[in-house]
Amino acid sequence: MTDTENVDEDRRVGRRSRVLKIAGLTLAGALVLGVATAGWAYWHLNSNIKSVDIDSALGTDRPAKAVTTPSAAASASAAPVPTGSLNILVLGSDSRSGKENKALGGGDSSGARSDTAMVVHIDAGRKKATIVSIPRDTLVTRPSCPLSSGGSTSVAYNAMFNTAYSVGGPVCAVKTVESITGVRMDHYIEIDFAGFAKLVNALGGVTVTTTQDIDDDDSHLHLKKGTHHLNGKQALALARTRHGIGDGSDLGRIGLQQMLVKALLTQISTHDLLTDPTKLYEVTDAVTDSLTTDTGLDSLSELISLGQSVKGLSADAVTTVTMPNVTAPSDPNRVVAKEPAASDLWESLR
């Protein structure tokens, strides 16, 4: 090989070396950026979640806790996947705090109450679930509840169920539910107006079928009988309407809420979120941004663990019922638990 050929070869080797070095640096930069982005996303979603230490506040004077057996975690970032039956109190808060909630809630309210209350029972195999709606107009004996500021609330007789949240927050809501059901709430999940609307929008809307016309000027919802694809604001209005259907009571509205829950489960099942990181982030961000949980679910890894344990749960495997009730003798606009049917229902969830 001549001197000229040697020089040309050295130049080619040098160029290849520079190209490989640039490619390596680019790849390394992309990897660092990807890891940093993933880390930021995890931190952001994790920091969205607000929590309340309900177990510490209520202590040991509670119904017995169901035994669960954790299985191996699916990944290092996820908590062990639990098995065994599970009872979760899910509340929809009518808080008007924040611009979005005030706009979606309509009007003004000096305090928040539980606008929707559901006890979600997941069976031991995590393949079936029963959702029991508790009418917010139910008259109950509200127990004394500890306050975060110190002291406690007084026992209240013939109190509306949804006042438990307004006087004592999540802790009192859980204690009241456990008092009237005799069932230990393993977890607590609360979502507000804005969070519900964002979730529906992140999923691309939700499809529902109404069996009658709905005309509610208060919620600005007007739907003809039939099938509709609703955006977040419309779905929230449907969940909250009570004057546009039936006799205007909370019982008619509960039926719509239960229909929406099953429709949302169906909508979620149409998305393969694990293979669509962008959609997964949108949905997770929408949920966690307006979420309050107990400390047992206050991290993304714990929520992922719960999600993995029920990933085989379909809308068809979910039964929705309302706590058996009758008109309250003291007030025709209120209801009380119908016995022994209500006690029998709660017993079946233990």
Per-region residue spans from a language model:
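Non-catalytic, solvent-exposed segments at the cell envelope interface
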Residues: 2-350
